[in-house]
Amino acid sequence: MGKLENASWIHDPLMKYLNSTEEYLAHLCGPKRSDLSLPVSVAYALIFLVGVMGNLLVCMVIVRHQTLKTPTNYYLFSLAVSDLLVLLLGMPLEIYEMWHNYPFLFGPVGCYFKTALFETVCFASILSVTTVSVERYVAIVHPFRAKLESTRRRALRILSLVWSFSVVFSLPNTSIHGIKFQHFPNGSSVPGSATCTVTKPMWVYNLIIQATSFLFYILPMTLISVLYYLMGLRLKRDESLEANKVAVNIHRPSRKSVTKMLFVLVLVFAICWTPFHVDRLFFSFVEEWTESLAAVFNLIHVVSGVFFYLSSAVNPIIYNLLSRRFRAAFRNVVSPTCKWCHPRHRPQGPPAQKIIFLTECHLVELTEDAGPQFPGQSSIHNTNLTTAPCAGEVP
């Protein structure tokens, strides 16, 4: 997330005589501290507190509640883990560099770690969002197939591939980064000038950024958009069909509410990550920097940084706002002994019609219009039918 260079983008062939090393270093690298350090740091601190607490709660409720251990929620768990990595490991480095643009004190290993971390979580996040969208598409459009194939064991295998691919594809950008020193005209290194930046030819960096932005943002978001469009058509078609009292029905309210929540998650994800990729692509396509271009880039860079970290904090808020089941799980984890923190049981309504959840193992997830369910509650009312556990699942 850090800038590759600062004032050195703009080549000054008539470098004037400077009286001190500090002035010379400031001429080469720009100011040591960003003008927006204080307000951005305050924003980052708020995002850090909300994001860490929220994502820890997400992980806890999924781990502790058996009813939430579904394939879709495993992907959301992966997304929460990547958000925690960014907030706990990436944000402190970002704040430090905001107040001390140079020197970089953590050496080559710290530089490699920083670059690999941001690249890995960037790729893992978009791949997790893509996989959960594909799972939702299969559950909506091909429910029988989802019942047979969408298992927790399969989700774990896919997540292993997601993180493995993310680490592998982070290596190209990581390998071209390193510690770079500024030099005096006589060739000696300027003290305190170490920065973590690109050390290979810039065309290599530009090519990597353009390729990864296409493979890990433009292409996945296009696929996700198509999938949610098809899901919307299917849900709209189902709503237009007249209810058949004899036919077996799918629990459409739950299916629709889960899809709505995931759609909002994807939409917010796209909004938050678009500035990040605009920032990277902007830098990669500019060949000759001017003061106006540098000013525009610096503005985009600050905005992209705030939105990048904001994306790591908003997901738990989305779950809490749009998922009754998740709100109940939150309350159960935060204050399990507080009787006022849990919703009262609703009065028993009229008998419900017989409903079979054709994709029960997949669709009973974070959201449920019928209210929160925990172990001991039943999803089928007034019916003698029983449901068998999904293949590969624990009852």
UniProtKB/Swiss-Prot annotation:
User: Which PROSITE patterns does the annotation name?
Assistant: G_PROTEIN_RECEP_F1_1, G_PROTEIN_RECEP_F1_2
> What SUPFAM superfamilies does UniProt report for this protein, alphabetically?
Family A G protein-coupled receptor-like
Q: Which domain of life is it from?
A: Eukaryota
Where would you find the membrane-spanning parts of this chain?
42-62, 75-95, 116-138, 158-178, 213-233, 258-278, 294-314
Q: Which residues lie on this side of the membrane: Cytoplasmic?
A: 63-74, 139-157, 234-257, 315-395
- Tell where it localizes: Cell membrane
| Topological domain ranges for the Extracellular compartment | 1-41, 96-115, 179-212, 279-293
GO process terms (BP) = arachidonate secretion; grooming behavior; neuropeptide signaling pathway; phospholipase C-activating G protein-coupled receptor signaling pathway; reduction of food intake in response to dietary excess; regulation of sensory perception of pain; response to pain
Name a GO CC annotation attached to this entry.
membrane
Q: How does it sit in the membrane?
A: Multi-pass membrane protein
Write out the GO MF terms: GTP binding; intracellularly calcium-gated chloride channel activity; neuromedin U binding; neuromedin U receptor activity; neuropeptide receptor activity
User: Which stretches does UniProt call biased (Polar residues)?
Assistant: 375-387
What are the glycosylated positions? N6, N19, N186
Covalent S-S links between cysteines: C111-C196
Ordered alphabetically, the record's keywords are: Cell membrane, Disulfide bond, G-protein coupled receptor, Glycoprotein, Membrane, Receptor, Transducer, Transmembrane, Transmembrane helix
Per the record, which residues fall in region Disordered?
374-395
Q: Does the entry feature the keyword Nucleotide-binding, yes or no?
A: no
Q: What does this protein do?
A: Receptor for the neuromedin-U and neuromedin-S neuropeptides.
Family affiliation: Belongs to the G-protein coupled receptor 1 family.
Q: What is this protein called?
A: Neuromedin-U receptor 2
Which species does this protein come from? Rattus norvegicus (Rat)
Starting at the broadest rank, the lineage of the source organism is: Eukaryota, Metazoa, Chordata, Craniata, Vertebrata
